[in-house]
Amino acid sequence: MTFQNKKILVAGLGGTGISMIAYLRKNGAEVAAYDAELKPERVSQIGKMFDGLVFYTGRLKDALSNGFDILALSPGISERQPDIEAFKRNGGRVLGDIELLADIVNRRGDKVIAITGSNGKTTVTSLVGYLCIKCGLDTVIAGNIGAPVLEAELQREGKKADVWVLELSSFQLENTESLRPTAATVLNISEDHLDRYDDLLDYAHTKAKIFRGDGVQVLNADDAFCRAMKRAGREVKWFSLEYEADFWLERETGRLKQGNEDLIATQDIPLQGLHNATNVMAAVALCEAVGLPREALLEHVKTFQGLPHRVEKIGEKNGVVFIDDSKGTNVGATAAAIAGLQNPLFVILGGMGKGQDFTPLRDALAGKAKGVFLIGVDAPQIRRDLDGCDLNMTDCATLEEAVQKAYAQAEAGDIVLLSPACASFDMFKGYAHRSEVFIGAFKAL
């Protein structure tokens, strides 16, 4: 796929949209940016990142009338709207960042493990990524978890990966046609996003697009929608809590089995709960499909506590717990981290915002955060977006200062959470370096 001199409109200016602008401009496209609502400070912020970028706002129809060849959609924008359907009828092409990545990995030959489902996909993606890393593969974990895929690709500067582990939402799959995963799963289907789809079957059909190509299908035998996704002539691995399948739970003994072969006791799996038994079965099946050895996979399952720098407890001092989520580089990841923690929180936010809107954090922080500490170049924007939501916000010149001030205010039972919702490159070499500084500041208390 060539973009040289193509006129492309990128719609939606969150993290995914920003990554598409960066990738497409690097590859010679004439790119413009669109968002239905654009504040002047947002235009200024993004304009500093991309010299000469043209912005459109208001009606998408008006923006599309300027002779664009391609519309690159962020996942939050449905292509099922009249303006976009008319654009396609008139010969325009619509795609998203996953389709752009598919073109890259198809040409380069990277293996891909793709994961979707109504529930459990983040856990399975994290576990699969962890297992691949522990087995020595050069692994990229991206998509609906962590960094947008093109941001991850740009950071790698074109270097081939052993495997991409992608969490994909139905929104991301809508305009993805060329992805051919080495192995893929739909974990389950339940009612979700029905404000965007005609009905549950329409939603399931969108999820099933993950199975294009001839890769291994990993399917939930207990879910009627998933059973219907089996494709003729394809290798299929079934997992089940109810039946004897390729991977199944022997309830009498509490052990996971592969056919007649004993695999692992559920009590040896750090992830608690019956639903996580299905997640482990799916993860092992996916990893075996890219050639990883079963014995090693099962040993590493026993040590899985979550990805490094992703909601990871690093220590405790005088009853105050410190949690590192430096890999939380976008608003969605930070909101999820906050939602998963029950104790009162002091949250450290900030860095390079990548043009994101931080207002969704207002609801996430409400009733849970006792204070917010702001660092980095986009701290002023975060303060503006959170203004008026009854939060005590403190500006800090360094991450070390934020850690010290958070600890000074915290009481036993509180949590100090680093989950910046931002990229790190304004102050650090990367999210891992940011994590190192956070850990160092904790140890220095």
From Swiss-Prot:
The gene is murD. This is UDP-N-acetylmuramoylalanine--D-glutamate ligase. Pathway: Cell wall biogenesis; peptidoglycan biosynthesis. Keywords: ATP-binding, Cell cycle, Cell division, Cell shape, Cell wall biogenesis/degradation, Cytoplasm, Ligase, Nucleotide-binding, Peptidoglycan synthesis. It is an enzyme of class 6 (ligase). Its EC number is 6.3.2.9. ATP binds at G117, S118, N119, G120, K121, T122, T123. It comes from Neisseria meningitidis serogroup A / serotype 4A (strain DSM 15465 / Z2491). GO terms for cellular component: cytoplasm. One of its GO terms (molecular function) is ATP binding. It catalyses: UDP-N-acetyl-alpha-D-muramoyl-L-alanine + D-glutamate + ATP = UDP-N-acetyl-alpha-D-muramoyl-L-alanyl-D-glutamate + ADP + phosphate + H(+). The keyword Nucleotide-binding applies. It comes from the Bacteria. It is found in: Cytoplasm. GO terms for biological process: cell division; cell wall organization; peptidoglycan biosynthetic process; regulation of cell shape. Cell wall formation. Catalyzes the addition of glutamate to the nucleotide precursor UDP-N-acetylmuramoyl-L-alanine (UMA). Gene3D superfamilies: Mur ligase, C-terminal domain, Mur-like, catalytic domain, NAD(P)-binding Rossmann-like Domain. Belongs to the MurCDEF family.
